[in-house]
Amino acid sequence: AKQIGSDKFKLTSWPGYTLISNNAKRTWGKTLPAEWFCEAHGPSVFKAILTGEPYQIRALICNATNPVNSYGDSKMTLAALKKVEFLVTVDYWMTPAALFSDYVFPAAGALERPTIVTHYGATDSVMGGRRAIQPKFDRHTDMSFWRMLGLACGQDPANWPWETEEEVYSYIIAPLGLPCTDWNDFVNNIRMYYPPLHQNKYVTRGGFWTPTGKIECNSTILRELGYPGMPTYLPCAENDIDNPELAEEYPIVLTTGGGFMPYHHSEHFQMQGMRYLYPDPYYSINPELAEKLDIEHGDWCWIENGRGRCRQRALLTPQMKPGVINA
């Protein structure tokens, strides 16, 4: 099946990944890990669940994510979670997605899994740590979950030769030729590996990681994908120029995602220390706009658009542009 969203969001899906990865192989000698630039577009997946276009998606696995709070248009996302035929959640918490899931699997905690940091293969450094304890009860690490699922679905066991993360990580670091026997030995005696610094690597490796081999201010790959090669400003889809009637009903521009940083999506709200620092939800508004609307710092306000509304307290700050709020 064709990757959902790859026809519109080309850079972060198969078309962009293929072009970028080919250049990575030319300069690095290996392809770019699929973690980068190789994703189905999330909102398009939810739309496909609801509409059946371009094809019907019948199953969804939510691994360490709470889609209701992680994507825009929460109502559409929630409707998709309710409609999909088979929903599985792997997480620490009983998230809204978990409440609608057919199966919920508890994930192993940070102390129950070994750690490797390679930035998904995008850098040439390796850092690691040992697990403190084996997973308790019926908790599983990500690798354990996907390995068992793959084997249960009939995948070739030869594709899953490792039974533990330590075996996988030992395999990953083996080509480095480091003076260690396995992953635990690496963690105990090396822990962090950075290769020797080489200046002017672009000379010996055939240039930079671009089709031209040069630093590109005008991206060849973006142009090949049908986008402008240079950064171009485009207003939001629902702007006052293209939608003057909508602007009359909703005259303030809403931006999101710039909230209190220890909170990310739905993370850390259960932590007493975080709630002590930030017990209530706040939105940011310029003092000039607040004065026009007779809003004072700390006032509870309704924030509303055509998709829904929420109630938050006002945080007056000159950092916000007049006419724009962040919630």
Region spans (language model):
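A cross-kingdom feature strongest in bacterial/archaeal respiratory oxidoreductases
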Residues: 3-10, 14-136, 171-327
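Non-catalytic, well-ordered alpha-helical segments in soluble enzyme domains
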Residues: 143-159
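Charge-patterned, long linear interaction tracts outside catalytic cores
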Residues: 155-159, 165-178
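Short, charged beta->alpha transition segments
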Residues: 45-49, 142, 161-162
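Alpha-amylase-like alpha-glycosidases and glucanotransferases acting on alpha-linked glucans and related
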Residues: 131-147
